[in-house]
């Protein structure tokens, strides 16, 4: 296979990111949920947990709910209560999640440069 395909270089670098000890290993569902959440965060939108659970409709609600908890346990997200209504919870990125996406971005740029 050709070695000069930027996307394949990026995938190779992204796989290396998964093996770094400073970032937790994410399975496909966790990664998908985190990526779906990141789109809302990029748009500076508050993401309610119920909205986060709407991502990946092919996955059961129970699985997505447990994966949100796992992402929190892994330090990639945190859940914060609304300041006016404690029943409403928001999914927010942690510093680790922001560093994860920053590193992925650097790898994307690097894959295009070589």
Regions found by a protein language model. Name each.
Residues 1-4:
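General nucleic-acid-binding
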Residues 7-36:
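Short alpha-helical segments that sit at the start of domains
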Residues 43-55:
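Short acidic, hydrophobic short linear motifs in intrinsically disordered regions
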Residues 37-41:
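Short helix-to-turn junction characteristic of helix-turn-helix DNA-binding domains
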Residues 82-105:
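Short, cationic-aromatic polyanion-contact patches
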Residues 72-82:
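A short, conserved structural fragment
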Residues 58-73:
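Short amphipathic alpha-helical interaction segments
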Residues 9, 17-18, 102-114:
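Amphipathic alpha-helical dimerization/coiled-coil segments
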